[in-house]
């Protein structure tokens, strides 16, 4: 399992530990990932994704999984998240055509 957020694409970054004597040694900054069960309002399903804690706060701020996925770029999303996004788009399109008819 990769250390990458399934919604934002945030992965490990590289930097330095800097000692008091200013000696730099390489280190990795790993994202704070946690498994989360996210509810889709339009689909009525729960999805288990491994996302960063920052992504979880962003989901709450934007108003839920569906809104976040519809506004996210496809390059950032994992293949699982892309499938969920396609399902949400199809459901929204079906609802729009039902209202128009």
Swiss-Prot record:
Q: Which residues form a coiled coil?
A: none
Q: What GO molecular function annotation could you give as one example from this UniProt entry? A: structural constituent of ribosome
To which species is this protein native?
A: Caulobacter sp. (strain K31)
Which domain of life does the UniProt lineage start with?
Bacteria
Protein name, per record: Large ribosomal subunit protein bL28
Q: Enumerate the UniProt keywords alphabetically.
A: Ribonucleoprotein, Ribosomal protein
Gene Ontology biological process: translation
| UniProt-listed Gene3D superfamilies | Ribosomal protein L28/L24
Q: Which family does it belong to?
A: Belongs to the bacterial ribosomal protein bL28 family.
The cross-references to NCBIfam families, in alphabetical order and at most eight, read: L28
GO cellular component annotations of the record: cytosolic large ribosomal subunit
